[in-house]
């Protein structure tokens, strides 16, 4: 009887010890392979190039991961032959464990980049923004957008290609090539130009590129949202009667003098197809990348008889509008007098 009790006790102790060992083993495995890899729980990223190896990837991960998870990742990588499946891209090292992170790396499950296309003055500015976040260089971008054949592929010229970059935030993979990048921007541009927007452009007897060119001028003329449709109406009125647009921002763009606070008569004869004082019609393309608000202001322009505008002499950022040259001259005189009074040159 005593022997049976001792045997039962030994069995019970053995089971308890086995259970403890199993629990410890499970805890260790979970700790090594399933707890978040990043230090302090903060998600960080690694960038894997085409020439990276498994060892160089481990080296990149080590500074941003906990020591135990970096070790565990390397062990799993060895077992699953990660050295044969290294894929370039941008990957998150965050709350996922070593096992799932290794799966992401092997299968190319990248963390997307949120790239914001801003309303900026030049393609060079867009190239700066894009190349800071993407794997392609600024040179790659500029070589593409100034190439007539590349532009023609998407239905543009080097002067109008900016129209393809509608200001918004887009998701990309870091290692997206410049060709694929441009294809996506074209797709997003086509999506932006809905049948409703196209119909409005057609009703105004404008192409989408012409709409965006006018919108770019408006964006430089004012930040006042309420005035934008009125100013759009002025330029459309001028186009209809074949009157020069005479837009000061186009002269600044032509001269690449964006710092000018005042234009003088001598500047208005600057020879450039972008100078709308010297040449009738629209400039060859946008003078900046207009916001959606500016584009929609043109599509929903106000119908009126104004053909003149002048900044108000109170420097409120708004404008005086006029139907006749006499009215405009009076408005312009007040503004010039105030410029002189304030010593603005």
Region spans (language model):
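Bacterial extracytoplasmic/cell-wall-associated proteins, especially those involved in peptidoglycan
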Residues: 128, 134-139, 147-345
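Signal peptide-directed extracytoplasmic domains
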Residues: 35-192
